[in-house]
Amino acid sequence: MKHAKTSITDVPGPALSRRQVLRHLVGAGVVLPWAGMLPIGTGFAQSPRTSSAPAGARIGTVTNLSVEDDQFLDDVEKASFQFFWEQGSPNTGMVKDRCNLRNPNQLSAASIAATGFGLTALCIGDQRKYVPAGAALERVFATLRFLWKKLPNHRGFFFHFANSETGERMYDSEVSSVDTAILLCGLITCREHFRHPAVAELANLILNRVDWSWLAEDTSLLTHGWTPEVGFLPSRWDYYSELMMLYLLAMGATHNPLPENTWNAWKRLIFEYDGMRYIGSFAPLFVHQYSQAWFDFRNKRDKFADYFQNSMTATEVHRRFCLELNKQFPDYSEELWGITASDSQHGYVVWGGPPAMGPIDGSVVPSAAGGSLPFLPAETLRVLKTMRSKYPSSWTKYGFVNAFNPLKNWYDSDVIGIDTGIILLMAENLRT
């Protein structure tokens, strides 16, 4: 089957995120090869792992980290933290969307999602003593004051991209629901970590300003966003993806919350691969990672699934999918696998699988394994350690590059905030 080409090098403007790319593809009528997807259902009685995983499936095989593995993860966390510390503005706390390693001081737009990861990174840096005592808290105060008083918002939701010093909207970007949610997750993490009355006051002011009911347009489903030029975006958060954090925040809000039945309103599509069934989505592996970076779904389930087990299954499926590609791309192996939305040699690509999505070319994306550390600890640790030892050009002062291709000897010159952030958070989640 010919794969749908999802590179966006021909799409004007630098501000397209992975969600915007997916919206662009759908709007352009691109047909994605979703073979293997089962009909929409209302869930299943057992978790995907216990109901469908074949005997011997190696899922979640590490319970205790060795001293060596813990030190390796600390190296990863400390390097990743440096991105947020150095690429975050000391004046505003806004974190650059990406950084070119060849010219790290060049001007770049900040993203509210990277800033949300950055707020969480400050908690980790404070706990791990990556910065002097009090330094992280000072940066948190600067960020929260800027978010409350100066960063433009609409009904409490923030524009996706902004000037890191002035807060001015950039690239005609949208007021983004999911990116605001990531920012709020970082905000709540700071409130709970520092337990400082002034931090809590600012955090609650920002949280209570968000009008969730407005963005739902009197329905149960949130839109992807809004712009002053066109109003609400047509896409809605209506099927499984990184949306879980959105709806948990919205239903738990003190002001303008969404009703509890919102949780049952979005669809859960059932996929099957190699005898394993799981709830999946029209998107790469990152959708199984983001909500679980902040919300602990372990040993919990609703009437549909155990979502932690579901992400474990989805990650194992992705690992097997990559190994199946070994004949085409011999570098893919038990020691090196993982594809999710990332840079490529020819531009930004939303790729992954199964089913195969995007023009897969042998590239490896560190955040695929790094963002899945709690789900397959042994397998993902093996991959990350292989990257650093056998592919030293994949390792930088900010941790791993965004992507690299061993077959073509190509290494990205950029680090992207949200991808470095998910590695940092999931490494910390595995350790603690």
Q: PLM features: residue spans?
A:
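Hydrophobic alpha-helical segments
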Residues: 31-32, 37, 193, 301
